[in-house]
Amino acid sequence: MMIDNNCGKEKVWVPNPEKGWINGDLIKEIPGEGWLVRDENGKEIKIEKDELRMQNPVIQEGIDDMTSLSHLHEAAVIHNLIKRYEINSIYTYTGSILIAINPYTKLPIYSKEMIESFCDQPVSKLAPHVYSIAESAYREMLNFQKNQSILVSGESGAGKTETTKFLLQYFAAMGEKGNGVNTSLISEEDIVEGNNIETQVIKSTPILEAFGNSKTLRNDNSSRFGKFIEIHFDKIKGTIVGAKLETYLLEKSRIVKPPENERGYHIFYQLIKGFNNSCCLKNSSNNNKDEDSSSSSNNNIDDLKSLLKCKASDFNYLISSGCDSIDGVDDSQVFIKTENALKVMGLSNDELIGIYKILLSILHIGNIEFEKGKEEDSSIIKYGNSSFGESFSDDDAGGYNPLEISCKLLGCSVDSLKSTFCSRKMKAGNESYTINHTVEQASQARDSLSMFLYSRLFDWLVVRINQSIDKIGTEKKDNSFLFIGILDIYGFESFESNSYEQFTINYANEKLQNQFNHQIFKLEQLEYEKEKIDWSYIEFSDNQECIDLIEKKPLGILSILDEESQFPKSTPSTLCTKLYNNHSKSKNFEKPRFSQTHFIIDHYAGKVEYDTNLFLEKNKDFIISEQVSALESSNWKFLTNLFQILSKKMNGGGGTSGGGGAGGNKASSSAAGKSTFKFTSVSSQFKESLNSLMTTINSTNPHYIRCIKPNTEKRANLFDNVMVLHQLRCSGVIEQLRISRSGYPSRLVYDNFIKRYKLIVAKDFKNDDDSNESKEWNSILKETDLNSSNGGTNNQIELKRKGAELMINKLSIDISSVQFGLTKLFFKSGIIANLELLRSQTMINSATFIQKIWRGYTDRKAYTSTKHSSIYFQSLIRSYLQQLEYNSMVEENSAIHLQSLIRTNELEKQFNQLLSTTIHFQSLLRRLEDSKEFNTLMDRIKKIVKIQSLWRSNLAKKQLKLLKAEAKSLTNVVAEKNKLASKLGDIQSKLDMESQLAQKIKNENEQLSSQFSNIQIEKEKLQKDFGNINLEKEELLLKYSALESEYHQYKQQNELIISKLKQHINDLEEKQHQHSYKNNEVVGNTSFEGSTTTNNGVTSPPKSSPASPIRNSINSNSDTTISGSSDDSIDNTDSLILSPKQHKGEDRKRNHEISSISPPRSRETIGHDDDDNNVDVIPRRQFNELEKEYKELKQMDETHKQYIESLKLQITQLEEKVKKSSSHPRSLLPGIPSNINDSPKVVYTKSSITNDNSSSHHQQQQQQHNISPSNSITSTTSPINMMDSNIKSLSYKDFTNSQEIDAQQQLHQYHLNNGTNPATSTTNGSGNPLSQSSPTGSDKHIQQSTISDLVSALNFNNCQLESGKYLVDLIIKNHDSIVSKYVPSEMGGIPEPAFILSRCFLKNIYDVDATVIGTPNSTNSGGGSGTGVLDPIETNVNILIYFCDKVEEVIYRDPKSNCSALCYWFSNFYTLFNIMETYNQDTKDQLSLNDQDKALIEKLKITLQTMIVKAHKNVVKNITDYIQPILHKSLNDTTSEIDFMDPITNYLNQIQISLSLENCYINNNLCKLLFEQLFSFINAMIFNEILLRKDLCCLRSSIPIKMNISELEHWVKLHHGKEWSSSVCDKLRLLKEVVYILMIDKTQLQNDELRDEICPTLSIAQLKQLLTMYSPDVDSFEDPIPLEILTSLMDSPKYNPDENILLDLSKIFTLKFINSNQTLSSSTSSENDLMATINLNALESVQYACDDLVSNIVKKNIEIVSLNNQKSIKK
């Protein structure tokens, strides 16, 4: 298959003078002349074959690397840039060059998310960007430990400065990463600029622009110097350690002779117009008010006040060019920015004044004029009638004298400086003589001084900037750091009139281009060598000849120029003549036809014609030693210091490169001894500076950025083709394309080549299926399909290479146009385009063939259908005709049959009529005969009837007679009947009366039964009330008995305590007199050997009679008397009553059922109730007895109520007496407060007494004896134990161990743990899970220290602060063993540190009664020697804040802390905060705090909030540090498919376990929030990667990503409910939309409705970026995204060009607090969702074993007490 490069009608590019290139169609070939082409305007043009420019295939439209274009030429390049610029893709690669087109608008592609996306990514994976070049330079610097350089070039206004800023921004972010900062999770406000070197470099930009930029014909802010910024990095970490700025090639001639219609440097114009607003003037006015202000400073200001009234037209240097302003620029406002930048760099007011004075002196020096002197060839200074300085002439009586003003400003002698202008000294041997200057030479000496001053000032500013940004010093450059240099230099220039400036600029660009060509050749060579292809015959162009033409000695242009500059009588003509004579034969040098002062140089970017009229003047840079001496002898300290600083820098090799930044002059006063007049040409300085720059660049690995200016109007979306094409030529881009085109610019890996173009040769192999070649091809295809990646083993690559060779042979491609590398195919320019045409044509042919087959199939199917329809239609017609014939025959037969029927009918009618007539006649005859016979018979019958009637009448008369005789005998019978009826009525009335009576009796019986039932119910109710009354009465009696018994016991114990206290105090006083140091032993012996005897706290109540316990108890209670009249009998009795507030938790915790005891039934008065329903009428006697018994019960109830009221009254009186007399005995105890409220209290609560029918009297006695359940003690300790808190200076352990109460505690806990009824056993409700015993309530058991003991231990001796901190240290010290340790509770697991701290300290803040108050004999809480009472709130707050600080110091700063540990401490702070919030809510109406206490509590709350945020950040950092590398590795691994699901879900399982409610007390909503944030982070990371990477933005990558997303969603649904799965999975919606878009037809997105339905979350800007980056798969038949779709998206009203298309990772993990009354919340949850529910009662009821902590705290307290006693004894 032979490829014809021009097969078919192809699209070509036609040159156009206005647009550069336009579209054209190739019509036909004209033999011997070329090709005939028709352009887009319809004009036909003949183009030679060599000039033909073919268009590239559609798939390469808007490609991001133009070296991949099949046809490499200017037209293709400019078209590609236009297409990319239309969609705001301003960056494009051309090989290793990055082309950056200035968009003249702000684009959202420079965010920190974009920086994060480019970090650690290869250039080939991401779209072109300035960050990509920066990343490449940064990674190569660290990986190869070699310095890098980035060369940024372009015209003025092309964006070089902005590009430099973006490079510095990226390097700063990399420096932050080197310090371990995750830049993706920190906002821009969080980045600290303390060591932000790049920010300081950027801030120096206004200074350099003011002193080094000027207005030119093509740019209002053209940089007239080059700068090289070195960013210094640490070799290992990659952090920024410093920076350095070097300047090159300052255009000094612009100071004295700006070109026509251009300006000098901006600073002159800014100073004149903006000095009125200078900060120096404001500061001077303030200094005048200060008596100590120096007079010299005021004199300096006075010298500058002349600036207030001058203008640019007053100075020769500023007005000579005819331009002194810029349209749209206010120089006065720019001056303020410049001055602020100088202040930022650290310049003082005196230094600012010094700068202004030098600038003003330069302007006045420029106003010095000369005239001829009296002697020949002499000159003198012209005084009076000056052409300049009109604003100054009025002030001076003698007229304006610029020389005098200049000398005054510089502090120099007028005579010494004057002589340097008009004459010079020459030495000949030992003699010296003076030579006068001509007027022209005097002007040159004047200008030389001005340029010298300005260049030195510029160099000094650079030195000062370096002092500000160079943190480590240049002396360590070779050893301690690496650097990346950024070169910002003006690009190639070519105007209608080109002078000396353009010559030097183009010379510099020629050198840079030469270095660039060698670098490109080197890169190409490395690529070819890597792939091992034959490249020896490839020729690369070189511009060395042009460089030799300019700089080669002795006959180079620069050498001839310097030679001519030293001859006084040289002219431009003589200069050009020498050039013509020496270089006329050079191919890079031409002589113009019509000019003798011009010459042409053929540069790499094209030919440039130079005008030499000002070459000689601008090349001269005389340095007169007398001028230097005059300046150095100045009495102005600033000027002399300036020269000294520069001299040190130059002698030390620092500063600008070779001093060439502003001229490189090293002359000083020492030069006066050798030569009084030294000539140094600008060109030689320029050459030296350039060579130094090239040496620096050559020592680095260079990278290139070419900035392009799209139009001169500085408008967005305006592209000037011709202007851009010119810049491409000047920037070397076209040259680079030419170099690439000379080699093999098109490259494809074997796998991609086979996949994309296999369909072209598929037909050839298919035609010969049996050949070995076809079999080999099929095996290659299988291997290619199995290995989708570009890599593989060597055998696989070799197999693919064979496949590529087979394809090349089948395609008949010239073997000289192809090179087979190790992994790639290399093609000459145009081959890929032809392959694309063939592929397109093959696809078209295949589509045509498929259409042909399909159309044949459809037509054949239609024909068959038509044929079948026709046959069927014919059959229908035939059937219809046959049916018609059949119907006709049927009708004929029917007619014949009908006729026969009609005839038959007529004959039948006739026969029937005759028959009926005959029959009728016969009937008439027969009737006549019968009538006669009937009449005869009737006459006979009448006669018979008459005879019979006569006979019957005779018989009736006889019977009547007999009846009349019988009637007379029936009258008597009737009378008897009437009598019987009367008797029957009487009997019936009697029966009715008896029935009514029976009914009445029955009704009365029913009423009595109803009354009996009601009375029975009332009886049962009264019996129940009677039982309750008896129970209450008995409980009151038991309570009174217990109170009385406890009083006597307590009185005995108090007496025992007082005696021991007195004995102990006596011992202490005796030992203090002896100056003994054994107080610790005394305290210890007292603590642990004190009163240990325990009396039963409650006596048994009186035993009741077994016959009738209820009535006996009532009788006994009625006979009981209540004593208590004396004060002794009621002393301290109220100490036995426990306050409800102290045991609020126990009362709420235990709700015992109260079972009533019913009295025995009276069997005498009440019959068998079960038989009542069987009795019809209740006997009256039983009813009366029942009514009587009811009255008795009612009366008994009233009696019991009165008795109970009397008992209550007596108990109340007893309690009042106890309260009145409670203070007397306690005041006798030394060291114990007399306030009885501080003592411990005990209360006995009512509990149930169960009395079943099966219970025995022995059980009742045992219940009463054990006090429980009838008298449950809710206190956890005995009164003696509680009193220990008031005698802290003596001991820690209780004076007595209440064995009775401890046994009850254990027994109650036993029943709680075993699920038995606590009402039938003993309990005290302490809730201690460790104090368990058998139900028998044994007194012997082992007691363990609980949290209550720990609280008491902490309060020991009022050393709470010091012992509390010691407790915190113990917790933190054992943090490894304490991690994942939780205290079980009914709310869930509570972290142990949070539980201990909340019970020991946090509770004390909100519990005033439990707060420890210092006693007069106690020390302060810290164990120090303070006196007075210390605020307990402050003590507890300080301990908790100390805990926060220790955790942050030990845990959070430990790099070894894993996620589980961090989650554990996160749960601690979260739990503490929620407990504190619950306390705030519960006690806000009860506590009355002063302002100081409120401030302390608020401080603690803020500290906890801060720690929660820090804990959250640490957890997030640990999570992201694990997940982020996994995602990066999965997305970047080319050897396998994307798979990040397994490692992430495994890690999520760990997080879920660490934060689950089963393990720690973390609110479920907080866990949900964390997972939502985590999934948002995954969504944002992958989304940002897809949006910027071509290898991910394709169909092939979208499938595995979708699978991983589905797996993640499945994991969430599997481990959490619907609420979690819906909200958490919703965080991946943006990623799911992107994946879906990658899979569908992209043309659907043009429709607004479909687009909103497909991707409702995705913004238009993000969608446009996604489609811009999308590239079809190599073997896909899909076309690239049409640019029309992208432009339509950009035209949408919803499109926001300033939108940040990437998701901000720093705003995902947010956790904030709403206000003081609300809890944690975030951007994704409501205000109260994150608040955990805390049950304070449940929390306080939990007892936890802490023996070790108690033991350690006790030991610590003993040490503190001992130390304090020693201190007190010493005092």
From Swiss-Prot:
Disulfide bonds, paired cysteine numbers: none
One GO molecular-function entry: ATP binding
Domain Dilute, residue spans: 1427-1695
UniProt xrefs under Pfam families: DIL, IQ, Myosin_head
Entries under Gene3D superfamilies matching the protein: 1.10.10.820, 1.20.5.190, 1.20.58.530, 3.30.70.1590, Kinesin motor domain (3.40.850.10), Myosin VI head, motor domain, U50 subdomain (1.20.120.720)
Domain Myosin N-terminal SH3-like: 7-57
Stretches of the chain forming a coiled coil according to its record: 1180-1224
Domain of life: Eukaryota
GO (cellular component) term, any one: cytoplasm
Keywords: Actin-binding, ATP-binding, Calmodulin-binding, Coiled coil, Motor protein, Myosin, Nucleotide-binding, Repeat
Protein name: Myosin-H heavy chain
